[in-house]
Amino acid sequence: MIKAISTHTKRHIHYLILNNIQDDNELINLLNAVNCKETILVLEDIDCASEAVKSRAKEEETVVEKVTDDKSTLENKILADQLKKVEKVSKLTLSGILNSLDGIFNSEGRIVIMTTNHSEVLDPALIRRGRIDMQIEFSNCDRYQIAKMYENFYGKNADSDILSKIPSDIYSPAHVSGLLLSYRNNPENSLIELTQ
């Protein structure tokens, strides 16, 4: 889908890999170097990209649990101080990411695409409306979607008898697309493969 958007909008695709970024300043400098009117900025698998994007609510629960499980006040204070030091080691922060996306890189017509398999672990501030204008879930394909993919890929309608034997909501769009590509010289075999 990203390639299709790139082709349609005549924009280059730039992948931003947060794991390779040392701190907020480096992120800001990278985004400043990108012409957002000619670019699609992609943060792929953002749930795995950095601890900075994970929900703060879970982090706070973990810290509270660790601190309240100990009985000694002095031990609690030492543990809390150590946890704060560990958190500061990561110089790429959620605040830096949000400010970079909203401020420096904020320009009319920008396209930023984030992909994730686990949106529930992301901090709500990262995916709130206004920051992320559209969320699209790619669930498993029903028969209609498989038929449309087949038609778009091969330029002809799928055999309705074979199509009716394909289980619905089992295969991801990526899986179906891969089969269509694998059987490009024998299209009907792609459908037969999906019936098994």
UniProtKB/Swiss-Prot annotation:
Keyword ATP-binding: yes
Gene3D superfamilies: P-loop containing nucleotide triphosphate hydrolases (3.40.50.300)
GO MF term set: ATP binding; ATP hydrolysis activity
InterPro entries the UniProt entry points to: ATPase_AAA_core, ATPase_AAA_CS, Mitochondrial_chaperone_BCS1, P-loop_NTPase
Residues that, per the record, bind ATP: N32, A33, V34, N35, C36, K37, E38, T39
UniProt keyword terms in alphabetical order: ATP-binding, Nucleotide-binding
Domain of life: Viruses
Family named by the database record: Belongs to the AAA ATPase family.
Name of the protein: Putative AAA family ATPase L572
Species annotation: Acanthamoeba polyphaga mimivirus (APMV)
